[in-house]
Swiss-Prot record:
Entry's EC annotation: 2.1.1.199
GO MF annotation terms: rRNA (cytosine-N4-)-methyltransferase activity
Protein name: Ribosomal RNA small subunit methyltransferase H
Organism of this sequence: Bacillus anthracis
GO cellular component: cytoplasm
Length: 310
């Protein structure tokens, strides 16, 4: 069953300033938590389009929200194709778009998907099960230099070189086939004192491989720009991030689109192309409350940012 505790539920949806007859997009359907609350805010004239790459998530939501009929539309697609998929549905602008960039709990908790360092499973980590690149390919085929780069850039792992060396040496004799084998190599690459602090030693490397397999940062950057273009004036974009790399992309994209660039002095009016597209609703990110953190440990790194189209 596709159960998932939704993070920052009301803050994210209420932050969209819902118009009951509006058109909204949930770019990350998952277990349907945000979609459920958003649908409850709509009248019969409103509708919600929900994206997910995961067929199980799509089928689950179709059953769960069948009573909404044509008000609820699912799209099995990566949200990097946001604009194209909406245009295929005849939709050129919307009232609000939300992103929840956390890996949904069912994906983490299903061992055979290979996302979790707590279970021994085949190295997979694909959000879209039809995608060609897997974690197995990354770990066994990518060069030492490529592994160091992703571990450092995407995982912010201090011991990237040591871990990549362990992987390189091991795979000369046999392929690394499971998450369990990978976890042991990561542990070997991290000095013992460092292994005892900062959570599970494999956390950062697993994050890095998952981001690489799914091209997550580039996809998000493209989709966020598309979302800003697709929302109507007065419409909003809500984004929940779970690590500093995603948050940096969101923060800089919102900031760039909400400020006027340096222009030559003495211009009588600001040309339209230089006028800010966005107004920041959250100057600082909204964080989960203490109560939410007690109920859902996975919310601890969540940050919510909201911007409005001018």
């Amino acid at each position: 069953m596709f159960n998932h505790v939704t993070v920052l539920l009301k803050e994210t949806v209420d932050g969209l300033d819902i118009k009951p007859d509006g058109t909204y997009v949930d770019c990350t359907l998952g277990g349907g938590g945000h979609s459920s609350y958003l649908l409850s805010q709509l009248t019969e004239g409103g509708r919600l389009i929900a994206f997910d790459q995961d067929e199980i998530a799509i089928q689950n939501a179709k059953e769960k929200f069948s009573s909404y009929g044509e008000q609820f539309i699912t799209v099995k697609s990566n949200f990097r194709y946001l604009s194209e998929k909406l245009q295929e549905l005849g939709i050129t602008e919307v009232d609000g778009i939300l992103f929840d960039l956390g890996v949904s709990s069912p994906q983490l908790d299903t061992p055979e998907r290979g996302f979790s360092y707590h279970h021994d499973a085949p190295l997979d980590m694909r959000m879209d099960q039809d995608a060609p690149l897997t974690a197995y390919d990354v770990v066994n085929s990518w060069s030492y230099e490529q592994l160091v780069r992703i571990f450092f850039q995407y995982g912010e792992e201090k011991f990237s070189k040591q871990i990549a060396r362990k992987i390189e040496a091991y795979r000369e004799n046999k392929a690394i086939e499971t998450t369990g084998e990978l976890v042991e190599l990561i542990k070997e690459g991290i000095p013992a004192p460092a292994r005892r602090t900062g959570g599970h030693p494999a956390k950062r490397v697993f994050q890095a491989i998952r981001i690489a397999v799914n091209d997550e940062l580039k996809v998000f950057e493209e989709a966020l720009e598309s979302a800003i273009e697709m929302v109507k004036p007065g419409g909003r974009v809500s984004v929940i991030t779970f690590h500093s790399l995603e948050d940096r992309i969101c923060k800089t994209t919102f900031k760039r689109n909400s400020t006027t660039p340096q222009l030559p002095p003495g211009l009588p009016i600001i040309p339209d192309e230089f006028k800010p597209k966005l107004k920041l609703i959250t100057r600082k990110p909204i964080l989960p409350s203490d109560i939410e953190l007690e109920e859902n440990n996975r919310a601890r790194s969540a940050k919510l940012r909201i911007a409005e189209k001018r």
